[in-house]
């Protein structure tokens, strides 16, 4: 199994699956994009991986990176001989699998990623989406009752660590808000924008 990870969240999404597959005797090869803390997380979980691609800003650089990642993953897959390739919103695994006559399984939960989905879906063998995903990708689509985050935050897999609050100088009953800022440079951000009003 070859799994390509393009985002830190993908490490969390796939980690339990990888451990389960390895327990069952499967060999899993991870390729990973150097984006934010993706490589650090893989190292923290003691996963071996091959870095492919690096985050750069701008649409042209994104397309250029996709082409280069396709070529890198193609070379790696030719040497590894996976039975199938997996990723999240990942055109490279779909393209490479098609070129090598292998199967690809792509997860996505981002309907508005029209460009990324448009260059991925036609080549993917299986497209897994949450049941709330309105877009109909045709007979290749498998809908599941859940969300990506349940792959790593489900109570069977996750126990909160209250020590984290202490590190932040918070008590368990303190109210707090988490705000995530983004650059709007990701493939699923093409044609999107954030809050335009000055706050």
Walk through the language-model features, giving the residues of each.
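Nucleotide-activated donor-dependent transferases that construct or modify glycoconjugates
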Residues: 1-8, 187
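Short amphipathic alpha-helix
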Residues: 8-22
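Short beta->alpha connector loops at strand-helix junctions that form conserved
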Residues: 51-55, 107-111, 130-131
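Glycosyltransferases and closely related glycan-assembly transferases
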Residues: 44, 74-85, 91-105, 119
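Conserved nucleotide-sugar phosphate-binding/catalytic loop shared by glycosyltransferases and other
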Residues: 5, 22-66
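A conserved, positively charged/aromatic
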Residues: 105-107, 114-129
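An amphipathic, basic-hydrophobic alpha-helix
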Residues: 59-81
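A nucleotide-sugar donor-handling region in carbohydrate enzymes
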Residues: 128-194
